[in-house]
C-alpha cells in the first residue's frame, strides 16, 4: 500500500478503536454515541430504561457502520483503486464491501426485532418482564427502575463502558451493548477475584480491583460480573441488602491504608536484613503486644543533610505491621503520592527515617 492508504488506514483504525472503547479524551471531546445522538436518546436521569433501550440500539448501529465508513474513506484515500466501482475492484475489496454492508443490515434487523411491541423484545425489557407481577408488564418494572435511579442515594461507579449502579432494589451493570439487571432480594454476590495493579493514575500506591459475581435465584436471569475498586467495597456493602461472600484466598483491602501496608511490607522485604546479636532476645512489639518485634531501623543513606535520614539506635521494638501503620499515620491523607518518598520520626527516639531504612530482623 502507498503512503496515503497507509496513513488513512492507521488513522481510521485508531479512530474506530477509540470510538468503540471511548477513552477519556473522546468523552471530553464529545465523540461518543451518547453525545452525538443526545437529542434522540433523551435524558438518562429522566428515563433510565427508555434511554438505554435507545442507546444500546444506536450504539450497535453506529459501530456496525464503521467498516463501511472505512471503505468509503478508502475510495478517496486510494482513488486509483476505483473502489467506488465495486464491479472493477479486486475480489478482496468486494468481499470487504459485502461484509461492510451486511453488518449494518444485520444490526438494523436486530434493532427492528428489539423495537417491536414498544421494545418488548429488547434484552433489557425481557429481563425486567421476569420481575413483573402477574397482571402487569415490564413497563411497570421499568417505571420503578427509573424512579430509583433518579434518587441521589444510589451507588454508582465504574467507567462509561462498564458502570455499576446499585439502588434500593436493583443491582445493574451498564455496558456498551447491554444493561444487566438483578433484584437485590434474590441475588447471591460472591467476590471471585481480587487483582492488584501496581500503577495508579492518581498515586504511586497500588490499586486493587474486585470482581464480584451477581447471580439471581431466578435461573432465567443471566448472571453477570461487576468490577470496582476495593476502596469502594464498604460503600457498596452499605447499599446492598444481601451479604457478599468471598471466595477462598481472596483478601480485600478496603482502605488506602490497607493498600499502603501491603506496599510497605513488599518494600521492606527487599531491604537488607538486620542480624540480631545472639546475646539479644526479641521482645513483643510495643505497639500491639501480640507479635514479636520484627523490624529494625538502620540508616542506609551516606550523606548527612538537614531533613535527611538519621541513625536510630533503638533495639528492635516494633513489628512490621505496627511500623507501617505508624509510617502511614504521619502522612498527608490528601497526598498519597508522596507517602513512600517521605521521612517520618522513629516512634521511640524521633530519629528521622524512610522506607529504605526499615530492615527485617533475621
UniProtKB/Swiss-Prot annotation:
Transmembrane regions listed in the UniProt entry: 7-27, 57-77, 95-115
Zinc finger (RING-type) in chain: 285-350
InterPro entries: TM129
Biological processes per GO annotation: protein ubiquitination; response to unfolded protein
Annotated metabolic or biological route of this protein: Protein modification; protein ubiquitination
Signal peptide: none
Protein localization: Endoplasmic reticulum membrane
Stretches of the chain found on the membrane's Cytoplasmic side: 28-56, 116-362
EC number per UniProt: 2.3.2.27
Keywords, ordered alphabetically: Endoplasmic reticulum, Membrane, Metal-binding, Transferase, Transmembrane, Transmembrane helix, Ubl conjugation pathway, Unfolded protein response, Zinc, Zinc-finger
Family indicated by similarity: Belongs to the TMEM129 family.
SUBUNIT field: Integral component of ER-resident dislocation complexes.
PANTHER family on file: E3 UBIQUITIN-PROTEIN LIGASE TM129
Function per UniProt: E3 ubiquitin-protein ligase involved in ER-associated protein degradation, preferentially associates with the E2 enzyme UBE2J2. Exploited by viral US11 proteins to mediate HLA class I proteins degradation.
Name of the protein in its database record: E3 ubiquitin-protein ligase TM129
Amino acid at each position: 500500500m502507498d503512503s496515503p492508504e497507509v496513513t488513512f488506514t492507521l488513522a481510521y483504525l485508531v479512530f474506530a478503536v477509540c470510538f468503540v472503547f471511548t477513552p477519556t479524551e473522546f468523552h471530553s471531546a464529545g465523540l461518543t454515541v451518547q453525545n452525538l445522538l443526545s437529542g434522540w436518546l433523551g435524558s438518562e436521569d429522566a428515563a433510565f430504561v427508555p434511554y438505554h433501550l435507545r442507546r444500546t440500539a444506536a450504539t450497535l448501529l453506529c459501530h456496525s457502520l464503521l467498516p463501511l465508513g472505512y471503505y468509503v474513506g478508502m475510495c478517496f484515500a486510494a482513488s486509483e483503486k476505483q473502489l467506488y466501482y465495486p464491479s472493477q475492484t479486486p475480489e478482496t475489496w468486494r468481499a470487504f464491501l459485502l461484509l461492510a454492508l451486511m453488518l449494518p443490515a444485520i444490526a438494523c434487523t436486530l434493532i427492528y426485532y428489539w423495537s417491536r411491541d414498544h421494545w418488548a423484545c429488547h434484552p433489557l425489557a425481557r429481563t425486567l418482564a421476569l420481575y413483573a407481577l402477574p397482571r402487569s408488564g415490564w413497563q411497570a418494572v421499568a417505571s420503578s427502575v427509573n424512579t430509583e435511579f433518579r434518587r441521589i442515594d444510589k451507588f454508582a461507579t465504574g467507567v462509561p463502558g462498564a458502570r455499576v449502579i446499585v439502588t434500593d432494589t436493583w443491582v445493574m451493570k451498564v455496558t456498551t451493548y447491554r444493561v444487566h439487571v438483578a433484584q437485590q432480594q434474590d441475588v447471591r454476590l460472591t467476590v471471585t477475584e481480587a487483582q492488584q495493579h501496581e500503577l495508579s493514575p492518581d498515586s504511586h500506591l497500588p490499586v486493587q480491583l474486585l470482581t464480584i459475581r451477581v447471580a439471581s435465584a431466578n435461573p432465567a436471569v443471566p448472571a453477570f460480573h461487576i468490577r470496582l475498586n476495593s476502596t469502594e467495597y464498604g460503600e457498596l456493602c452499605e447499599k446492598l441488602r444481601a451479604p457478599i461472600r468471598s471466595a477462598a484466598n481472596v483478601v480485600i483491602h478496603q482502605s488506602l491504608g490497607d493498600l499502603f501496608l501491603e506496599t510497605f511490607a513488599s518494600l521492606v522485604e527487599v531491604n537488607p536484613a538486620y542480624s540480631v546479636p545472639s546475646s539479644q532476645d526479641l521482645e513483643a512489639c510495643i505497639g500491639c503486644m501480640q507479635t514479636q518485634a520484627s523490624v529494625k531501623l538502620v540508616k542506609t543513606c551516606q550523606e548527612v543533610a538537614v531533613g535527611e535520614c538519621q541513625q536510630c539506635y533503638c533495639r528492635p521494638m516494633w513489628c512490621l505491621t505496627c511500623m507501617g501503620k505508624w509510617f502511614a499515620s504521619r502522612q498527608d491523607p490528601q497526598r498519597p503520592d508522596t507517602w513512600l518518598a517521605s521521612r517520618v520520626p522513629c516512634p521511640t527516639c524521633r530519629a528521622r527515617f524512610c522506607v529504605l531504612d526499615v530492615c527485617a530482623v533475621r
